[in-house]
């Protein structure tokens, strides 16, 4: 707020402010701020990053325009390196996966087995990592699951693109899109003849140097293709998963988490910025209609807990029916799902890995 008061025209600052408020569930002036935001976007002003926009407005045309404004400012197509048409036919197709998340992270929780199960008679698999070298169990598994692991944390966009060219990648797959630690600039320099956006970010990148976005008919209905700069490569289901993941042995009791023994338990473990006032209104109405029910949600900030407690009371619901779950290690996090009866999804930014986790643990998911 202070930064906005000092320099309201600073690029993308309004969006950063709104995203922070969404993380804290501060909704007091949200409707007016969203009206201001969409007006500025329609005037081609640089006000918000595409990732932050996903949770705010369910309008694919505005989403695309947001991406185009952002990427033209931050990652315009580079002509430092000429575009690659194609390489002479290799014996094996060379695929490079690019990510900041080759570690314990939701993206790797979904994709770890993907790297392992490529047919090595037909494919050569490279990983280009620009995230922390954590050496945790997931990081080591992915290193072992690919043919070549390239640590490019200290390399520039151009040097990384040159490395990809030197190993003659046929296909470069961006697993992050506009999420945290994104390096879209690598793709702006044409790392490979074919460039694909997949799984980490399901909005359009808004530029012509991404050839395809992998999706399914639920994520992107055919009538919505016009809102994407990429061609849509449809799979029966876009989301890969890890079939080797075992169910946790940990057993929680309701008492461990502070849940009444006889209550029907709704839950949502999505990040707080995905919760909108409209979504919270729906949750309040559901609680009203199910006597003795409670809502278990993941919140990691005390200020967010205070704000959501205020919001539930404003909707006429006893604050004790809102129960906050803390961040837990993966086995305990999964085990906690066993305490719930129904997962309530957020809108417009739905659950991804969290929905898969719920289903894995036998918990039904109600989405929209």
Label each region the model flagged:
Residues 1-259, 271, 281, 310-315, ...:
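Alpha-helical solenoid repeat scaffolds of the TPR/TPR-like class and their adjacent stem/linker regions
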Residues 92-96, 263-265, 294:
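Residues that mark the start of a beta-strand
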Residues 346-348, 367:
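A short structural motif in glycosyltransferase catalytic domains
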Residues 98, 269-270, 298, 325:
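Short hydrophobic "strand-cap" motifs at the C-terminus of beta-strands
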Residues 122-124, 284-314, 319-320:
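A conserved nucleotide-sugar
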Residues 341, 362-363:
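A short alpha->beta transition loop at the rim of the catalytic pocket in nucleotide-sugar-dependent
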Residues 344, 358:
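Donor-sugar nucleotide-binding helix/loop cap in glycosyltransferases
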Residues 151-153, 320-329, 347:
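Active-site donor-binding acidic/aromatic loop of nucleotide-activated sugar
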């Amino acid at each position: 707020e202070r930064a906005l008061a000092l320099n309201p025209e600073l690029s993308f600052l309004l969006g950063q402010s709104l995203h922070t408020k969404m993380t804290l569930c501060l909704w007091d002036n949200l409707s007016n701020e969203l009206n201001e935001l969409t007006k500025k976007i329609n005037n081609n002003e640089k006000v918000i990053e595409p990732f932050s926009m996903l949770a705010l407005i369910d309008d694919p045309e505005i989403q695309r325009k947001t991406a185009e404004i952002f990427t033209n400012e931050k990652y315009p197509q580079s002509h430092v390196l000429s575009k690659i048409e194609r390489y002479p036919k290799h014996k094996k197709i060379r695929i490079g996966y690019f990510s900041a998340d080759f570690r314990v992270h939701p993206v790797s929780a979904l994709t770890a087995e993907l790297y392992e199960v490529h047919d090595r008679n037909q494919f050569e698999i490279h990983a280009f990592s620009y995230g922390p070298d954590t050496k945790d169990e997931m990081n080591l598994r992915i290193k072992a699951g690919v043919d070549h692991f390239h640590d490019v944390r200290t390399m520039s966009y151009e040097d990384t693109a040159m490395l990809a060219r030197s190993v003659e990648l046929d296909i470069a797959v961006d697993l992050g899109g506009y999420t945290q630690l994104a390096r879209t600039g690598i793709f702006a320099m044409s790392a490979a003849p074919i460039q694909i956006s997949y799984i980490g970010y399901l909005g359009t990148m808004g530029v012509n140097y991404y050839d395809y976005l992998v999706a399914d008919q639920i994520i992107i209905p055919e009538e919505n293709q016009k809102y994407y700069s990429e061609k849509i490569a449809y799979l029966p289901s876009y989301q890969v998963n890890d079939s080797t993941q075992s169910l946790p042995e940990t057993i929680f009791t309701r008492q461990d988490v502070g849940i009444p023994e006889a209550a029907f338990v709704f839950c949502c473990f999505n990040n707080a910025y995905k919760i909108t006032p409209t979504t919270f209104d729906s949750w309040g109405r559901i609680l009203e209609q199910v006597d003795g029910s409670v809502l278990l949600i993941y919140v990691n900030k005390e200020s967010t807990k205070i704000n959501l407690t205020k919001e539930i009371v404003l909707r006429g619901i006893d604050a004790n029916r809102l129960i906050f779950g803390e961040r837990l290690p993966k086995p305990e996090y999964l085990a906690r799902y066993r305490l719930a009866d129904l997962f309530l999804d957020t809108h417009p930014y739905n659950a991804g890995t969290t929905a898969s986790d719920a289903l894995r643990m036998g918990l039904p998911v109600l989405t929209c």
